[in-house]
Structure formats: C-alpha cells, structure tokens
Amino acid sequence: MEIYIEQLKNQDAEDLFNFELTNKSFFETMVPSRGSNYYVYEYFQKQLAELLKEQTEGISYFHLIRNTEKEIVGRINLVDVDKEKRIGSLGYRVGEKFTKKGVAASSVKLILAQARVYEINEIHAMTTTNNIASQIVLEKSGFSREKEAETTTVDLNGGNVNFVHYIWRTTKD
C-alpha cells in the first residue's frame, strides 16, 4: 500500500477522532485504553490542542499516515524530544483494516527520514512482548532490541504484559 506521512494539524481533528473511534476496540487489544473521555469529541479536541502545543514547542512531532486517497490509515509520532541530546521516542498505530499491508514498516522508514530533518539522532521505542508484528517492524527498520523491561508491565485484557525496548541510532553520511 502506498502511503505518506504529514504533520498533524488542527484541521485533522474530526477525521482523526473518527479514526480513533473506529479502531478503539482493535487498538485496545494491543495497548492500554486511552480512557472513555478520549472518545468524547470535546475532550478529544482539548487533547489535540495540547498535542499541537507540544508540536509547536518542538517537544513532540505528530504525524498522520495517509493512503493515496488521503484517508487516515494510522498515526506515527516522535515524542519526548530532547533537542540538546537529540533523542526522541517513537510511537505508532495502524488502523485495523490497514494491517498486514506494509503500512507500519513504510511509515517507520518515513519517520526515520524525517527524524534527520528534526535533527534527532537516537530514537527509543517500546512494544509489548505479545506484539510480535511491531517487534518485527522495529527490527527490520534498524532498531536494536535493548531489553525486556522488568518493571514496566501493564494489564492488558486481564493479563500482564511486559514491554520490549528498542533503540535506533542514525548513521553518519
């Protein structure tokens, strides 16, 4: 599937809200819930305003993943950016009907290229031990598996899962 990424903007609010609402149950099989308030549009708009403020300040960079029909197929973000150390953390999610089409791998490749523009040289990522697909995407994208977090566990669908930590570092041209 051909995709591109673009920076999140306020005008994306309604489409993004619908994307999140449509994929709520699917996402919650892999990551902890965002809470019921997140799916109330007025609350969502406030959260979006906070994200856009972070983006303006250069603390985080939020992107939508879109297909050639301009439909939102996922999100990919660089957050907790430390400009002095040139470090950030990666997060992404792909909508249920767009999985197994190479969207995650393609969008990670695109965000790593964008990281150079943002002057980020090291990116940390975490995924749960049960999310094998995400582990494969990260490893094939040049991330190194660092360790399984011993103290970072979450309750997911009635069971505890640990996080696996990854790091990507830019190579000098």
Protein language model features and the residues they cover:
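Acyl-donor (CoA/ACP) binding surface of acyl/acetyltransferases
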Residues: 2, 7-15, 19-26, 62-173
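Conserved GNAT-fold acetyl-CoA-binding loop/helix
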Residues: 28-49
